[in-house]
Curated annotation (Swiss-Prot):
It is an enzyme of class 2 (transferase). Residues 127-376 form the Radical SAM core domain. It catalyses: adenosine(2503) in 23S rRNA + 2 reduced [2Fe-2S]-[ferredoxin] + 2 S-adenosyl-L-methionine = 2-methyladenosine(2503) in 23S rRNA + 5'-deoxyadenosine + L-methionine + 2 oxidized [2Fe-2S]-[ferredoxin] + S-adenosyl-L-homocysteine; adenosine(37) in tRNA + 2 reduced [2Fe-2S]-[ferredoxin] + 2 S-adenosyl-L-methionine = 2-methyladenosine(37) in tRNA + 5'-deoxyadenosine + L-methionine + 2 oxidized [2Fe-2S]-[ferredoxin] + S-adenosyl-L-homocysteine. Pfam families: Radical_SAM, RlmN_N. Its cofactor is [4Fe-4S] cluster. NCBIfam families: rRNA_mod_RlmN. This is Dual-specificity RNA methyltransferase RlmN.
Length: 409
């Protein structure tokens, strides 16, 4: 279903009773774990490896979400699989499509233990040569970064490897990115190749506070016999959980991004409070030692541009000094407004001056084009619906944003 640009689509709600049944999912299991699960339902040990390969292909190459579609699996085994496991997608509570083609899905996952169902947001950003999916790793966030909307939502829980991967699987479903899939009429997607070519762990939450589940999900996403994403097209963004940075490069091997945002400890303590635990000196040293870092595999430093806070040319000079010797590029992010914030975006002319100074010092300094602002899908704007403002306030704000879209950019 295609919606008018910038308006919310109430997607047909699928109850997904299979997902809500409490049955364990095969999605997100390693090959070893999947083999153990199959053995537990009676698959003969000599067949386990072959059956795992079959299921892996159906789940991650063909993209099926129903055991009945696994046509080369014997019916008796399919019935056993259906009785014991689920491979269902999460519910789509809402799908929104921005004026610029950005899509945002509000997804609902079932309770874990005694908890309640939870909601998270996932964003798809299409461009001519690539399609980037921004994936969440937690429900809410514990970091309370003062400029970030997600940081105003308390941490509810970590997402499982299944729930992290399901965001990618659902997006590929909706965009027709699996074999035999069809792209929605009028959808803005890359003209060639995969619709989802890149993923960034930049959604809700701090990925390195959920290291094991994120690691499992990303290793499955980059497995050459399945989803087969290149590790050079997967970026994990952290606010600076220093002890896990080396492990990220060593055990996962994806590209690294650092949510920097300030070049002085006193300011970063305020903007990104984790800096009080892991100050800039420790953070930059961890970046210097990141496995595989080189001019071909640079670390991205994200820097949100806040008017009269961190956008002076003196800040730019200190930034260049701070990163001296680190293979890096600096993404400058115009601040994306959200209801209740006290911050303002830097003037565009000041952002360009800042970028020019960094560029002349030898660092690539692209200014990130704001995407999805009108549906609160831009950087720093994500927050699950159940924790957002009252509905009337939200609708009024979104109407204002839609009316002003274009003037902002």
């Amino acid at each position: 279903m295609q919606a008018p640009a910038g308006l919310a689509v109430k997607a047909p709600l699928i109850a997904n009773s299979d997902l809500m049944s409490g049955k364990p999912s095969l999605i997100g299991l390693t090959r070893e774990e999947m083999g153990e699960a199959l053995a537990e339902i009676g698959v003969p040990q000599k067949q386990v490896k072959m059956r795992v390969s079959q299921l892996w292909n159906w789940l991650y190459v063909r993209g099926v979400s129903d055991f009945d579609n696994m046509t080369n699996v014997a019916k008796e085994l399919r019935e056993k699989l259906k009785a014991a496991f689920t491979i269902a997608r999460p519910e789509i509570v809402e799908e929104q499509i921005s004026n610029d083609g950005t899509r945002k899905w509000l997804m609902r996952f079932p309770p874990r233990g005694a908890g309640r169902p939870v909601e998270i947001e996932t964003v798809y950003i299409p461009e001519e040569g690539r399609g980037t999916l921004c994936i969440s790793s937690q429900v809410g966030c514990s970091l309370t970064c003062s400029f970030c909307h997600t940081g105003t939502q308390r941490l509810v829980r970590n997402l499982t490897a299944e729930e992290i991967l399901s965001q990618l699987l659902l997006a590929r479903d909706r965009l027709g990115d699996f074999p035999d899939g069809s792209t929605p009429v009028g959808a803005y997607v890359p003209s060639e190749g995969r619709k989802v070519s890149n993923i960034v762990m930049m959604g809700m939450g701090e990925p390195l506070y959920n290291f094991e589940h994120v690691k499992t999900a990303l290793l499955i996403a980059t497995d050459g016999d399945g989803l087969s994403l290149s590790k050079r097209r997967v970026t994990l963004s952290t606010s600076g959980v220093v002890p896990e940075i080396f492990r990220t490069g060593d055990e996962i091997g994806v590209m690294l991004a650092i949510s920097l945002h300030a070049v002085r400890d006193d300011l970063r303590d305020m903007l990104v409070p984790i800096n009080k635990k892991y100050p800039l000196k420790e953070l930059i040293e961890a970046c210097r030692n990141y496995p595989g870092v080189s001019n071909a595999r640079r670390i991205t430093f994200e820097y949100v541009m806040l008017k009269d806070v961190n956008d002076s040319l003196e800040d730019a000079k200190m930034l260049v000094q701070l990163l001296k010797g680190v293979p890096a590029k600096i993404n400058l992010i115009p601040f994306n407004p959200w209801p209740g914030t006290n911050y303002q975006c830097s003037e565009w002319a000041q952002i360009e001056k800042f970028a020019d100074f960094i560029n002349q010092a030898g660092y690539a300094s692209p200014i990130r084009t704001p995407r999805g602002r009108d549906i609160l899908a831009a950087c720093g704007q994500l927050k699950s619906e159940s924790e957002r403002m009252r509905k009337t306030e939200r609708l009024a704000f979104e109407a204002m944003m839609i009316a002003n879209h274009g003037a902002d950019d």
